[in-house]
């Protein structure tokens, strides 16, 4: 008699069965595919990414621009690093389904993802298309606007082995003037990442700041910064008129931002902070627990990145 439950043999219907199981569990990417016509973004993308002057058809063909924009949606929604995007697309069937990739299709590598993201950002396309995408979700009723969750997460970068003088120049904003006589070395240097400390632990890299719709859990707005930027300093950028009159949920790092909240008439659901000789009361602790239970919904977003 078998000790464990048999998992069953692989059949031709496994992929379809898995897709149906994901649908029953509420696959958010499948819902996006059903309600958003991503072809609406093609012309704007091709205007930036297609090389009109290129006559030769030699060399590897680029990935479809709409599919790559969907890759950016995955990166944006789950707040993933370029490396994690590549890994998760390879690993997760729901991601491949969303992108229209079969199991044997080649997945864009992290360098391709980075290059696409950089070109979108530098052309101004990133902010414009993501706003159009969020507007479309609003119109389709996928963003509920019944409260916003604010949070930040570290994205670690490789440590740089610079001299003290080089680090001083970088800190003073002169990093672009370094290593001009050695292009290979300069290409490998990261002059934007910064050191910071949190909870007694040192971090080197960047920080992702996000605003997430409380109900749909979709990231409506995000900001990438050096790790040294305090969480609260991103708040003014993240909030806008679409948040008018809503509740805001955040940890105690955002305490003291009354003027910014008042600007949009927001309801303060930020966790309170205890101070020396003024610890939190039991009532405040209980209030924080209730707020944190809602704020913790953001953890699934950062789970891929910090896991």
What are these regions (language model features)?
Residues 59-60, 101-105:
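A Lys/Arg-rich helix-loop hairpin that forms a DNA/phosphate-binding surface
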Residues 171, 247, 252-307:
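Helix-centered, glycine/charged polyanion-binding patches within enzymatic domains
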């Amino acid at each position: 008699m078998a000790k464990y439950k048999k998992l069953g043999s692989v059949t031709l219907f496994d992929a379809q069965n898995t897709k149906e199981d994901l649908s029953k569990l509420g696959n958010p990417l499948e819902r996006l595919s059903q309600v958003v016509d991503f072809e609406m973004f093609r012309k704007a993308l091709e205007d930036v990414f297609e090389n009109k002057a290129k006559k030769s058809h030699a060399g590897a063909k680029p990935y479809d621009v709409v599919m790559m924009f969907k890759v950016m949606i995955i990166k944006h929604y789950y707040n993933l690093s370029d490396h994690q995007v590549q890994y998760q697309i390879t690993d997760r069937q729901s991601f491949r389904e969303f992108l229209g990739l079969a199991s044997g299709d080649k997945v864009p590598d992290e360098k391709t993802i980075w290059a696409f993201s950089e070109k979108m950002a530098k052309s101004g396309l990133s902010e414009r298309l993501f706003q159009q995408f969020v507007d479309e979700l609003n119109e389709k009723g996928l963003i509920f606007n019944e409260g916003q969750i604010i949070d930040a997460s570290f994205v670690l970068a490789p440590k740089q082995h610079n001299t003290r003088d080089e680090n001083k120049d970088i800190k003073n904003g002169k990093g672009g003037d370094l290593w001009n006589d050695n292009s290979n070395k300069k290409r490998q240097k990261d002059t934007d990442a910064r050191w910071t400390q949190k909870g007694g632990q040192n971090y080197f890299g960047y920080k992702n700041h996000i605003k997430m719709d409380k109900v749909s859990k979709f990231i409506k707005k995000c900001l990438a910064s050096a790790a040294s930027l305090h969480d609260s300093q991103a708040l003014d950028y993240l909030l806008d008129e679409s948040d008018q009159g809503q509740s805001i949920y955040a940890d105690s790092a955002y305490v003291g931002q009354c003027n910014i909240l008042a600007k949009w008439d927001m309801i303060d659901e930020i966790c309170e902070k205890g101070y020396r000789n003024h610890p939190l009361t039991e009532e405040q602790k209980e209030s924080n627990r209730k707020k944190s239970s809602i704020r913790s919904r953001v953890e699934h977003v950062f789970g891929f990145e910090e896991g």
